[in-house]
């Protein structure tokens, strides 16, 4: 599924019945959240609120509200095809040189895709049709959603933040929520390990006391948005990955007030700076955990320029107890992660992050066990291989006869193949999401690994149980007469 920008993608969704235009007057204060939440839980379409109360700018919600729409946004026909995206990322992370002419021929499609990686720089762009500076910059004219009753203020949720550290050539793209402080100021909530925060930290070391340039794109094309939340290799820019997904180069334009490049087709661009040392208390906000988070201090982003399309659309979402849009994204991106893990750990059969576990706090792994202690090695690998899993609190490892995505199967393995003392690993003082108020210290907590695999010699002195399985002959015999028995309708 190919498209050029967000509007092109919305047209494709509308053709497929995956976009609902709402002409009723709907308030960005709480009402949009309730409507979007009910729609998402029902597996409904993306929503375009064309008449937000008090504003003349439409609001787009629930864009990635189903795994199928996430797949479409990544240029794929269905969710299963996301495995191919994962295979491509695994290849780019650790490319294998061709072993011969035949292997070279087989790899040609991947090499052809790589040709779409460089960005295309434009001198004029739709995102700069309207230019506002100084006192004309006014975020209160944008219908930023106030999502939950006890939220501190309206919250920008889908802002694609563009930064560049002083020691890096490529830009970093990240999604960080931004609390609106006033007409030209927001709070940039980025965690210390995220790319934008690391760029800022390095900038402060290299240029102490100097303002750090930042730009934020709202309403970028889906491939670029999804590239920012996908585990791309550190050597690959999110713009380059978006070009791979889209099948054509990502078009960018230089910002008016700094040297950063932003998606040319975006709806709205915020340009400005972060003053080192300028912090503000952020929150509380209802979050993907299903709770309001604690108040904490983060840098203030001052906006000097606001550029946009003439008829801009504001792209937004909400976060809350799963399922929400981030949880749906997690379900889809799970399919991308599996081939990346399998490239490093070929023994892994499947990997599953249940959305009820806040998309990353609990992982279930199934594997082909080959030796005593193998499950514990895989646990350690999951925690250390990708940054995305550094906050995963629980890792459950099962044999490949268990369906990682069937909780009944997993519970059976835990209760029949585990001794709690022998088969549980506990680690203290590890990185934990600061939103996890269950940890004893903000940002620091424990992890648990559960080895629910069959135990090998050396792991137990007991004779291990044999699973009960009916013979194939009897199964086939009953299959032939099952319908005639007329037992279950």
Swiss-Prot record:
Cofactor(s) for this UniProt protein: prenylated FMN; Mn(2+)
Pathway assignment: Cofactor biosynthesis; ubiquinone biosynthesis
Keywords per UniProt: Cell membrane, Decarboxylase, Flavoprotein, FMN, Lyase, Manganese, Membrane, Metal-binding, Ubiquinone biosynthesis
Keyword Cell inner membrane belongs to the record: no
UniProt keyword annotation of Magnesium present: no
EC code(s) of this entry: 4.1.1.98
Active site: 287 (proton donor)
Protein residues bound to prenylated FMN: 175-177, 189-191, 194-195
Record membrane topology: Peripheral membrane protein
Cofactor note: Binds 1 prenylated FMN per subunit.
Subunit structure: Homohexamer.
Function as written in the Swiss-Prot or TrEMBL entry: Catalyzes the decarboxylation of 3-octaprenyl-4-hydroxy benzoate to 2-octaprenylphenol, an intermediate step in ubiquinone biosynthesis.
Protein name: 3-octaprenyl-4-hydroxybenzoate carboxy-lyase
Gene this chain is encoded by: ubiD
